């Protein structure tokens, strides 16, 4: 059998020409074996009808096998020639013929050099895409950080607004005065707390 892959023919037919011929070869061999078995059975039956026949079934089987080997050898020789003819003249696509799906190659030929350049360009674009993706992730992380800082800043401003409102409530319109008043109040509260703790410890020791 031929060893040429014939990939273009396989693309067109949907099967390799060698596979087709191999199936024909196997089918003929199977048919030849079946025919020889049937012929052998007929010969044995005819020999049984002959009185005092000296030909035994074993001899008949040997003769049948020899004839089968002869027929198989002849067929292999003829099939080799037939295979070569079919592969070269029937199941073969001429070099100047393009399949419909490959017609674009005729109008837009693409060489190996162009393919290498295209692959290189694709590789460079993939690298650029990775860089852009990393940059985008970094920007998103920075944006989230800015959102967090903005939220904290808003809380701080709200806190200062509340301090200013407290100052107005206490009669001080200036923020510094309000802050000083608040610090003074905190110190008074801390002093009161310290006195309470001291008194509590004194009572516990008594």
From Swiss-Prot:
Coiled-coil region: 102-206
Disulfide bonds: none
Predominant location: nucleus
Record's subcellular location: Chromosome, Centromere, Kinetochore
Keyword Electron transport: no
Keywords: Cell cycle, Cell division, Centromere, Chromosome, Chromosome partition, Coiled coil, Kinetochore, Mitosis
Gene Ontology cellular-component annotations: chromosome, centromeric region; kinetochore; MIS12/MIND type complex; nucleus; spindle pole
Family matches, as InterPro entries: Centromere_Mis12 (IPR008685)
Pfam families, alphabetized: Mis12
Subunit structure: Component of the MIS12 complex composed of MIS12, DSN1, NSL1 and PMF1. Also interacts with KNL1, CBX3, CBX5, NDC80 and ZWINT.
Function: Part of the MIS12 complex which is required for normal chromosome alignment and segregation and for kinetochore formation during mitosis. Essential for proper kinetochore microtubule attachments.
Similarity field: Belongs to the mis12 family.
Protein name: Protein MIS12 homolog
Taxonomic path: Eukaryota, Metazoa, Chordata, Craniata, Vertebrata
Gene coding for it: Mis12
């Amino acid at each position: 059998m031929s060893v040429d892959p014939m990939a273009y023919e396989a693309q067109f037919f949907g099967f390799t020409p060698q596979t087709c011929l191999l199936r024909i070869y196997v089918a003929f061999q199977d048919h030849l074996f079946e025919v020889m078995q049937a012929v052998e059975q007929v010969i044995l039956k005819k020999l049984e009808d002959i009185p005092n026949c000296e030909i035994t079934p074993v001899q008949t089987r040997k003769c049948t096998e020899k004839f089968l080997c002869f027929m198989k050898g002849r067929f292999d020789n003829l099939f080799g020639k037939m295979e070569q003819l079919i592969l070269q003249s029937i199941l073969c696509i001429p070099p100047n013929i393009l399949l419909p799906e490959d017609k674009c190659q005729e109008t837009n030929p693409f060489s190996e050099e162009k393919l290498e350049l295209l692959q290189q360009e694709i590789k460079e674009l993939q690298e650029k895409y990775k860089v852009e993706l990393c940059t985008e992730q970094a920007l998103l992380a920075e944006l989230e950080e800015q959102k967090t800082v903005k939220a904290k800043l808003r809380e701080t401003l709200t806190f200062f607004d509340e301090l200013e409102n407290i100052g107005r409530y206490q009669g001080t319109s200036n923020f510094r005065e309000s802050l000083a008043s608040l610090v003074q109040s905190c110190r008074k509260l801390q002093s009161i707390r310290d006195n309470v703790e001291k008194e509590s410890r004194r009572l516990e020791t008594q």
